[in-house]
Amino acid sequence: MAVAVEGARRKERILCLFDVDGTLTPARQKIDPEVSAFLQKLRSRVQIGVVGGSDYSKIAEQLGEGDEVIEKFDYVFAENGTVQYKHGRLLSKQTIQNHLGEELLQDLINFCLSYMALLRLPKKRGTFIEFRNGMLNVSPIGRSCTLEERIEFSELDKKEKIREKFVEALKTEFAGKGLRFSRGGMISFDVFPEGWDKRYCLDSLDEDSFDIIHFFGNETSPGGNDFEIYADPRTVGHSVVSPQDTVQRCRELFFPETAHEA
């Protein structure tokens, strides 16, 4: 009987895992101080983590100053979890070049450059392919565009499906090569080995024996870079539309007594 009572009293081990762009911050912008403060309040009740497609330096820049991010979050998974931090310590890092090999990698890069060379857009800037540890990030307009140019491209992309058509061309060209593609943010898409989507981080969480992993993301429809982890049976998925929506969902789940105040 004592064992049963002890089991009933055991505090559930819960992890709230958040996407970054569109979920905790506006795309590629800094986190709002009120959202940041709420997350620390949430951390008093559950463990918290982030999983983003961007490299560690970009995630750190958006969610704090310097390396604050690995102190403010229990888990930080950069580049879909191929770069992993737990309780402030680097756990592991994988590299796409070792996995794919140089020949396939160059074929992929050359195809993307050739395809983009034929695109006529209102504007093109720089950094069309960003090489990361766990993926290639491909941007037809170029990642160095301004916020205004980013919005302009995003609106055009909604009408003309620029990224969607690009991805379809890649799927045809590299069929059977073990590659996956997903949209992320407003101006780009990611290319990565099969299995290296955001679910990659869940494998390393298995050993921590969480009772529930809540995942919050905004790109949760098929083709979005949150879809696979959102739909994975190991998570309870929550589709959000903004950082404020994320905060409200968490209030309803973990602070129901104050949810009406939002």
From Swiss-Prot:
Domain of life where this protein originates: Eukaryota
InterPro entries the record matches: HAD-like_sf, HAD-SF_hydro_IIB, HAD_sf, PMM, PMM_cap
Primary site of residence: cytoplasm
Binding positions for alpha-D-mannose 1-phosphate per the UniProt entry: R28, R132, R143, R150, M186, S188, D190
Pfam families in the cross-refs: PMM (PF03332)
Disruption phenotype: Mice are viable and fertile and develop normally.
Entry's EC annotation: 5.4.2.8
Location(s) in or outside the cell: Cytoplasm
GO-annotated cellular components: cytoplasm; cytosol; neuronal cell body
Pathway: Nucleotide-sugar biosynthesis; GDP-alpha-D-mannose biosynthesis; alpha-D-mannose 1-phosphate from D-fructose 6-phosphate: step 2/2
First-tier enzyme category under EC: isomerase
Assigned keywords, A-Z: Acetylation, Cytoplasm, Isomerase, Magnesium, Metal-binding, Phosphoprotein
GO biological process, one term: cellular response to leukemia inhibitory factor
Family of the protein in this entry: Belongs to the eukaryotic PMM family.
Protein name: Phosphomannomutase 1
Protein's organism: Mus musculus
